[in-house]
Amino acid sequence: MRPPEIPEGHADTSGQFLVAHPKMPANIFAHSVIYVVSHNADGAMGLIVNRLAGAGPLGKLLEAFGLASKAQREIKLYLGGPVGIGQGFVLHSDDYAGASTRALKKGLSLSTGLDVLEAIARGRGPRQVRMLFGYAGWSPGQLDGEIARGDWLLAPADTSLIFSEEPDKVWEEALKHAGLPL
């Protein structure tokens, strides 16, 4: 199946960062860096990569999904966006592929099934991982309008920022990648 045609004037930002403009009003997207998973004529979907929500043992997360595990590895959970808060996503390096894995750009993959969590618990998962819940979504043309209005700056995606252990510094670094250092 072919992806939908991209209308004239539409820029496909898939595989790039959306970096919140410094003047964006205080809301969930202020100071956000979003990895754009897909952007086509049907709309866009992305994941905020720098909004830490909490941390805890991987075993507790697996138990919440009904999976027995003694995994004590500490994991961090991130808010991927305000849509579908009950949905979980694992944005990871492309060295793992399971039944629910979708290959993305820039050496990244996205998994949405329990298989990736089980693989991580067994030490057979991807080398780099960002666990998120929820996502950012835009209707057709909405993201294009927000970019044209100046709400978002575009920057090349950088895996060192996606998987950074210092999410509070990611926005400022991404601004530099977008050509707008503070």
UniProtKB/Swiss-Prot annotation:
Entries under InterPro entries matching the protein: AlgH-like
Source domain of life: Bacteria
One cellular component (GO) term of this entry: cytosol
Family: Belongs to the UPF0301 (AlgH) family.
Protein name: UPF0301 protein MCA0413 1
